[in-house]
């Protein structure tokens, strides 16, 4: 985190695209004594936000879970655009209570296939040129990523049934 921008930072004006956090995830963070109300922000489901989620999860019904007139929670950010839980050496949350998206990143499941985000600011992306290398660097395996992805979707009210389990 001390090297510069990370996945835990957003550019000014891009806050609407921050990934949503579920109510159970908020409760877990609060229950662990690691965050109060000021760590979470309730924001409207903007058209850009819904479109971005639809791009990331094209097989799921984003509009039902995040209706146009609705809202969702996300982690708060500082004036500099950093997640409120980002410290000088990375995330200050215990791994067990981190939002599922944060535990997944930069790994992802897209149309049933494992992949990873190749954002320039991703430090892991600098060192990994294959999915196998990324999984090893993140200390995980494909089945764990699929499980986390299903868990994240379920917490957000996104029905995955057989759509993303291939």
Predicted regions and their residues:
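Short loop/turn segments that flank or connect secondary-structure elements
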Residues: 1-166
């Amino acid at each position: 985190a001390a090297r510069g921008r990370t996945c835990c930072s957003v550019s000014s004006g891009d806050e609407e695209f921050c990934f949503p956090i579920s109510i159970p995830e908020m409760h877990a963070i609060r229950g662990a004594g690691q965050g109060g109300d000021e760590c979470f922000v309730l924001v409207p489901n903007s058209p850009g936000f819904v479109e971005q989620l639809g791009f990331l999860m094209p097989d799921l019904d984003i509009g039902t879970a995040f209706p146009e007139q609705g809202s969702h929670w996300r982690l708060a950010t500082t004036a500099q655009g950093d997640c409120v839980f980002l410290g000088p050496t990375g995330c200050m949350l215990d791994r067990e209570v981190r939002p599922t998206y944060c535990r997944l990143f930069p790994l992802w499941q897209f149309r049933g296939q494992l992949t990873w985000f190749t954002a320039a600011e991703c430090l892991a992306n600098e060192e990994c040129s294959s999915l196998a290398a990324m999984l090893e660097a993140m200390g995980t395996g494909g089945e764990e990523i699929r499980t986390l992805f299903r868990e994240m979707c379920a917490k957000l009210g996104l029905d995955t049934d057989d759509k993303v389990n291939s």
